Amino acid sequence: MASKNSINKPKIKINAHSHAKTLGRKRAARARKNPSTKSSTSRYAEVSGTATKPSDSTAIALYTGEAPKPTGVVTNTTLSNKRAKKLARNQKYIDQRKNEGLGKEHEMDVEVETEEQRQSRLEQIKKALWSVVQNQSEGLYKVAVDAEGTTLGVQAF
């Protein structure tokens, strides 16, 4: 037999089960009565049957044509002319900002060198290096073999 304060006492088990059952019944009744929201349904449920979140803008959804289907609750899903004009004006400003951003990116790309410029610069470097090699073989450049210092430019004593 379980001790006096045991969690597994038969009386506590029966009461806990009854309590959980009552809470489950209330939860099911609430789910049947209220329309389902995006947060109360699974992620694979039909989205069109769910009510919008309070943070979702109904006006923007109506303006873009993405308004959800009615969920049984009477709602006013009209968009006033004033609000529609405001949304159109804001959309125009958003498009303008996007276009200005693209223009600034193009202005900054002025110093991009083309393939021809890169090849011509490479040819100049090759030509200069080969002239040094040819002049060295002819004896025009004197290389000091007994020079002091290291290849890192630090003098060693």
UniProtKB/Swiss-Prot annotation:
Region (Disordered): 1-55
GO BP annotations, alphabetical order: ribosome biogenesis
InterPro entries documented for this protein: Ribosome_bgen_Alb1 (IPR022784)
Location (main, coarse): cytoplasm
Stretches with biased composition (Polar residues): 36-55
Compositional bias ranges of the Basic residues kind: 10-35
Annotated Gene Ontology cellular component terms: cytoplasm; nucleus
Subcellular location: Cytoplasm; Nucleus
Signal sequence, start to end: none
Keywords: Cytoplasm, Nucleus, Ribosome biogenesis, Transport
Keyword Metal-binding on entry: no
Function: Involved in proper assembly of pre-ribosomal particles during the biogenesis of the 60S ribosomal subunit. Accompanies the pre-60S particles to the cytoplasm.
Similarity comment: Belongs to the ALB1 family.
Subunit structure: Component of the nucleoplasmic and cytoplasmic pre-60S ribosomal particles.
Protein known as: Ribosome biogenesis protein ALB1
Organism: Scheffersomyces stipitis (strain ATCC 58785 / CBS 6054 / NBRC 10063 / NRRL Y-11545)
Lineage summary: Eukaryota, Fungi, Dikarya, Ascomycota, Saccharomycotina
